[in-house]
Amino acid sequence: FRSPDGTYTYRVSSTDQAGNTTEVEVEAIELDTAPTKIFVTAGSDKLAPTGNGLYEEISFSTIVNRREGLESWQLEMVDQNGISQKTFSGEQRIPKEIIWDGKDENGEFIEGRYKARFSARYTKGNRPTAESLSFVLDVTPPQTEVSLNPVPFSPDNDGIDDELEISLDVSDTNSIQNWKF
């Protein structure tokens, strides 16, 4: 037997062989079986707070399908090792958008791949969680090395050091988006 959602009173009574009766009542028992689904999306797949005006912050949108009975919420920035580096939290009211500047709880940048983990706590006991797609926090510029051979070179068609060989070596902990020479 399944009871419909609603507010109930639980009453227990007993009578012994001598006819003595007692009754205990618990009021306002809330039965709520409605699902509590939550979602989080990252506004970008990269965060590079370097001061150049590109990808300085990352925004997160949260969706909660049910606000009734919401006690608290939490949005954690979790690194590739599963360690929470930054936490945003609150009671009941969830902002439509949460902005992260890339700094951990100590005000430092810890580079790497992250996910946002969103969780909520309801009075009825539900604890739904959701994760965003991953994104990269990168504040270190690529390492670039240029080498020339011969130095000096003399393009005078005398057959000695007329051609210049240029070698490039570019490395980064993340992928190189583009380059030009």
Task: State what each model feature region is.
Residues 1-181:
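Short loop/turn motifs at secondary-structure boundaries
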